[in-house]
């Protein structure tokens, strides 16, 4: 027990001295953390509210009802299921509910940002779906005209857009017209940009024509780790999704998430516009400074990004992982990532992916992004000792330890 206590303490101490730029992570506020730790973490609630397979859930039903109704109201949806315990399981449930083995679907492809669950190696392949890809331009934007032509040709059961890399809003309205002609549904995987959508500064998928939003709840949306499905869909499809969530792909759905998820939505309703706006400003500032310092930042002709993400081409196959490893030694945490031109093999990507949402949560703004870019340059381009830079990174991070854009204690 002592060793485990020590390891956990060391992790906490180290991460408080790091600049975390992982695009798929965030931190909850102290208020939401308090909601997260409760007796609910010990309980089971198979089924949907008021139709359970266990007793003792009178308050759980009220909590889950409240969470789902608030998310439906905020996102303008007529359906919400907060039970998926991850974004991947949300995708499994949504895909299974509206397709059958052998159906064809269109995704972005991993080169252009789709999550592995959209692909043959993940949920789509496991469900027996035939996956083909939408078309992209060289500037990291979707080619709507060619993609619509492919929809008309392939006649997919559904298309899935959004995903792991999403620098710019996607052309939902244009795709909707083609999907309507062939009877295809649109699933928008908002895992990375849910907070930006909630704040009204990215795009509004349901208003623009998506049928279903699948998502996780812990990236730009700073809630507990978990998943969710939202949509404007018919009652039969709603029931199919609910049946896919349970019993097909999960049992209990980690009840202690629910109060914290509600708290995070309330925080976004109060502070989200300022928070999300600063996230994007920070991403653009970091991208510009990296570009000015000599890095090959993608999508420069389009202003680099309109989300929390920045993509950098590190030059050669495998350099993404090499640079990420060097930066980790300097207490700068980010990840290697496939970029356009890498193909589908994730082992030796040329790119790195950067996200600004967590450091923004701790109060960093454009000046701090410029300083982070300089740290990255010193390690990657100037070949300074990562361990030496790590000391300066720790001192820099020491001034940013308080979670912002949240209710005070």
Model-predicted segments: where are they?
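N-terminal "arm"/small-domain region of PLP-dependent enzymes with the aminotransferase-like
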Residues: 1-51
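Short acidic (Asp/Glu) and glycine-rich catalytic loops that position anionic groups and cofactors
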Residues: 11-17, 42-49, 238-243, 258-267, ...
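Flexible, glycine/charged-enriched surface loops at secondary-structure junctions
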Residues: 18, 49-50, 79, 252-256, ...
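Conserved PLP-enzyme active-site core in the AAT-like
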Residues: 66-296, 314, 356, 364
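Glycine-enriched alpha-helix->loop->beta-strand junction motifs that scaffold or abut catalytic
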Residues: 209-211, 331-332, 352
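Short, conserved charged micro-motifs
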Residues: 236, 317-324, 362-367
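Conserved small-domain helix->loop->beta segment predominantly found in fold-type I
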Residues: 265-266, 276, 280-325, 334-348, ...
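PLP-dependent enzyme catalytic core of the Aspartate aminotransferase-like
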Residues: 281, 346-409
